[in-house]
Structures are given as C-alpha cells and as structure tokens.
Amino acid sequence: RLKIKGLDSNMLSCLPNLETLTCFNLKDGTHLGIKTPNLRSIDIYRSPKILNLNFLLDLKELRSIGLDGLSNVEEMPDLSNLHSLTGMSLANMKRLQSFPLYHENLKNLLLQLPFDVLDNIIPENLPNLKHISVNLGSDKKNGMVLDRFKGICEVGIW
C-alpha cells in the first residue's frame, strides 16, 4: 500500500508487488502499468495535470478505481478489457464529456458527474451491477439516471 502526493510515475522504481496506490496531485500516470503490474486498487485525487486516463488500460489487475478532482479529463477510456474491475467511483470531473461504460463485471458504481454524462449510463451495459449511487447535487435530472436502475440493483443517493 502506498499513499503519495505529487507523484510522477516516471520517477517510480518498479514496484511489482504494490497492490494499492493512493495519489494526490498525480502528474503523469503513463508508466504505472509497467512499474506496478499487480496493482489492484488505484485512487487518484485532485490531479489537474492528468489530461487522459489511457494509462488505466495497462493496469490489467485492477479491481477498483477511484477518481476525484481530475478536472481536465474530457473522456474516459473504454475499460471493458479490465476483467477484474468490480468497483468504480468518479467525482468532480467537471470537463468529462465521454464515458463509454459497458462492463460485465462491474458491481459497484459511485458517481458525481454532469447529467449529460450520467444520461448515457444504462442498466443493459452493466449486467452484474449490484449497487449504484449518484450524487444528485443541484441538478434534479440526475435522479432520472437512478430511476433506470430501480428494481435491477440497489440504488443510493449521496
């Protein structure tokens, strides 16, 4: 387990046994897949220098992703090839416009995203989802997203 502030993944030594990484102000994630091949959980907070998340695709053992405050990310990569991924939390990603979410194994989803992004999330693309929570914020339209999941999985508001 490693918690670090201001990480540049280029400067990491190879940490083949690291399973949990929590980063604040991540500067670059490009080499995380090479340096941390067994990473199972990653949480990235307040990292405005991150422009894309393609490096997540190299983290083949990921079970959990938490992203909060990545204010300059505009699109999420397609994570459907991360077969071990069962939990995802996305919050405060104000520029996020594209979120291709189809994932067979995802069981838990926690979201605080703009309605335009949330509106594209449909139950059929998440066949094993057990729990979804959405922060309604001031946009009451976000509740419509949750309505789609009622009767399919546990629904929560935060």
Feature annotation, model-predicted:
Residues 1-13, 17-51, 55-74, 78-158:
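Concave beta-strand-loop units of leucine-rich repeat
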